[in-house]
């Protein structure tokens, strides 16, 4: 879809929905001119959203609903059309599920959402002399940065997928070893991988459990006796020198080097009858 040079949305109090919808349009077309008003001019030539009962409004009946029952708001309607071109179909769906749907739900039902509250606080208070449109575009600038970060992160996952898949093909016993830190969850989400080992951004190496795509819990967590313990206790309990940390939730350890992390994962496999 080609974005026209002009956009129109409602005036008055603004919400996360129209703010993020505007941010999305600005990301795609930086020179778009946004007008706010209470009535769409008959001769308006551009994209209209969150007002006017058109393709990108959600105040009319019948409304559009997702398969899970969550109604679309203007941001979700725009993202459905424009998102795949920015990040691909899979990542667009994930951003909708994890980021946009809660905003759409808030706009349609008033359900509590902290990000929506934060955007709402940009509205001038009752006795303020601030111009409402100025406040609106301040909120849009913040929303644009947030959304750009989402898009950048999604595309980073897309770039990492090939490397993650290659590491998975080379893996043994359910242990995937990455050459560097990569966003790996997207690539291993529905595989039989059990652990991922990678150089830690804090130094040393990390080993992390792969979660079950249905339960969202680690398929094979690290031992309870390691969880949240100091290094000397973990080393004593495991018999492995160099494991410096095990998260209390048992999904992550850090170790001095790759071999130590690999030894720890193999011990868990052996103790659970997987080797």
Where are these regions (language model features)?
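Short alpha-helical "patches" and their helix-cap loops
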Residues: 32-42, 89-105, 136-137, 157-158
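Short helix-capping/linker segments at secondary-structure and domain boundaries
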Residues: 28-32, 83-91, 215
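Short loop/helix-cap segments at secondary-structure boundaries that form the rim of catalytic
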Residues: 40-45, 54-55, 187-189
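C-terminal accessory domains and tails appended to enzymatic cores
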Residues: 18, 22, 37-39, 63-69, ...
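N-terminal ordered "arm"
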Residues: 4-46, 50
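A basic- and aromatic-enriched beta-loop-alpha substructure that forms the phosphate/nucleotide-
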Residues: 46-127
